[in-house]
Amino acid sequence: MAGEADDAIAWVHLSDFHFKTGHDYGRDEVQHALLEDIAMFAGKRDPARGAEPLHLDFIVVTGDIAGSGTADEYVVGERFLRELAGVAGVPADRIFPVPGNHDVDWTRDMAPFLREHIVGRERVEEVWKTPASRRSVFADKLAAYRAFVSRLNPQLRIPEEQPGGFGHRVPRS
């Protein structure tokens, strides 16, 4: 925030958007209200309100960006998050998404993976032994999420490239 120490960090944490195509059940109104609130806090509206504008360093979006992990849902989500970034005065590469259970496309068939990789108890234990091997079970089911992240913020580590973690070191802006 303006007036605070230069090393202070300001961010917005959002979660559970469940972006979908089709009927939105009032989602547009809620998202519009969120954009209005962010615009107000970022000083883009109502300059007479008496408070200094909030300078945001980044936006974190945790879990359930999509409704069911499909590519079309991420198109909707990306469009909104880019609009949010513009209103907040934050570059899109300062948006940090983290997937949730709805970001996994559970409709994708696991049978081919199971047939190819799991034969007997020892093999099952081997697959679940490390974060990297566990991540491989879901890599295909996170394909739409990975494509979304690559478009939104290409510098991020994404599951297939960094098995076992979604961390990212954020330089100060």
Protein language model regions, located:
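N-terminal active-site segment of His-dependent metallophosphoesterases
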Residues: 1-76, 80, 88-95, 105-109
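Extended active-site neighborhood of metal-dependent phosphoesterases/phosphodiesterases
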Residues: 78-173
